[in-house]
Every structure is written in C-alpha cells, then in structure tokens.
From Swiss-Prot:
Keyword Secreted: yes
Keyword set, alphabetical order: Hormone, Secreted
GO molecular function: glucagon receptor binding; hormone activity
Organism phylogeny: Eukaryota, Metazoa, Chordata, Craniata, Vertebrata
Coiled-coil region list: none
Location (main, coarse): secreted
Extra remark beyond the main annotation: X's in the sequence were included by homology with other species sequences.
Gene behind this protein: gcg
Full protein name: Pro-glucagon
Keyword Metal-binding: no
GO biological process: adenylate cyclase-modulating G protein-coupled receptor signaling pathway; negative regulation of apoptotic process; positive regulation of insulin secretion involved in cellular response to glucose stimulus; protein kinase A signaling
Length: 103
C-alpha cells in the first residue's frame, strides 16, 4: 500500500513538473512574441505539440542514459525502478501513438 501511495505521489510530482515546464515555455514564448502571432493561424497547437514531443523524447533518452541506480536498499529500488519503467514505457507509447506523421 505504501508503494502505491509513493508511486501516486511521484506521478503527481511529475505531472506538476511538466505543468511548470509548460508554463515556463509559454512565458518564454510570450516574451519572444511567438505565441501571440502564432495563435490565430493554428500554429500554436503545432508549436505545443513540437514542444511536448521534444520534451518526451528528451526525458526518455535521459531515462535510458541514466539506467538503473544501484542502492543498498535493493527491494525499494527495484520496486521503484519497476514503477518508473512502466511509467516511462506508457509515456513513450503514448508519445508514439499521438505523434502525427509528418510528410
């Protein structure tokens, strides 16, 4: 039960972090004039999709590079890694499924 609570809390943290990153991206785009001009012609959605695709790809590559940490607390680390593996796989598959094919 505590593992599920931890996983849920961690998932909420990741969602919060993504939201913070997105807000920061919006603020940076607004300062550079990217959003106000692009919103009317529909490119805002495309810009957001590109941002999210790049972010998902970067997070997945970072996850692959870091690999599995080794700790003395093997059981907790193992369970935590399994939860992260599942979450990363789900996010990667969602990204692949939801990415429009560019011609």
């Amino acid at each position: 039960h505590s593992q599920g609570t931890f996983t849920s809390d961690y998932s909420k943290y990741l969602d919060s972090r993504r939201a913070q990153d997105f807000v920061q991206w919006l603020m940076n785009s607004k300062r550079s004039g990217g959003i106000s001009x692009x919103h009317a012609d529909g490119t805002f959605t495309s810009d957001m999709s590109s941002y999210l695709e790049e972010k998902a790809a970067k997070e997945f590559v970072d996850w692959l590079i870091k690999g599995r940490p080794k700790h003395a607390d093997g059981s907790f680390t193992s369970d935590f890694n399994k939860a992260l593996d599942i979450k990363a796989a789900q996010e990667f598959l969602d990204w692949i499924i939801n990415t429009p094919v560019k011609e």
